[in-house]
């Protein structure tokens, strides 16, 4: 049996249509689950996900300050936690500690129950906010997985076990790509470019998101305007515009403007526009604790807002990034994945992640409804997001950052 495991995290986040996922059909209303709704297990892991998200962001930002950044910390963490079920020793400890968990303070069972609850919550049908996540376990036809690992990834992470002929790398590549393409309604195609011939197992995770603004922009008000990438570079972008009441505050601690824009449903986009020359300060200073204070402050102010249409993506080989967070052994010959299979020693050869973000005017689908907003009779201040800014998409039920990114140049896909 080949002695290599190729692990792919293939993830998608996009403001595009997708129907509700299948996990919600498995979540049954029991007395215990009703009781847990007040203090769900996902809330216990939320602070750790937030810390992991910002740590991962800082590593990516340190690699380059001239490129867009966009990723889903929830999806990456979910895939790593799922993989940890089959690891032992230092390999096991590194993964969970890299996710900001301290096993002396939180039982491992609570960690996995937290992710189980997180996935059930995110995949619950919602007529306003469309969000789903999927996990696929592609297994070499001749590889015998341990029953406990297979049972745990199915019950806790709702992973599909899919027999795969990895001896035919092209056939296996097409099978994985078809799974991702179907799960993302055609948004991502040909994501896996090549597979190593020694691959025996691939973990594939995707997340898909479509949000509708509570208060959409009018397409007729969108005009081409300048966006200042840096002091030497200016690009023309479609700039959306809306006069109205916004959750907008200036934070002296972050030296940034903080704008919250709600989606219909249970999610909010937080945009952080640093004062000129203060991007590095913002990146070094921002914490989820600070952002949580703004999420609780729902005061509004009258603003004439200008915001660029955005269509960006982030594609990452996570191996180097995770090394910076102390997750190294799983990628080495010393990796202990003996909880996955006893057939052969395994190591993770590849960890891929892709996320896509689209921001546009459409807050709702066309419908016979009218929205009237009352605004004071005064000259409002302008607020232009015409230079690089950060974005965090936050889900309220799970208290988790679904996506984190930086828009440096809205015209670069």
Curated annotation (Swiss-Prot):
PROSITE patterns: SERPIN. The modification Pyrrolidone carboxylic acid is found at residue 25. Coiled coil: none annotated. This is Alpha-1-antitrypsin-like protein CM55-MM. Residues 1-24 form the signal peptide. The keyword Disulfide bond does not apply. Glycans are attached at residues 65, 102, 165, 266. It is found in: Secreted. It comes from Tamias sibiricus (Siberian chipmunk). Expressed in liver.
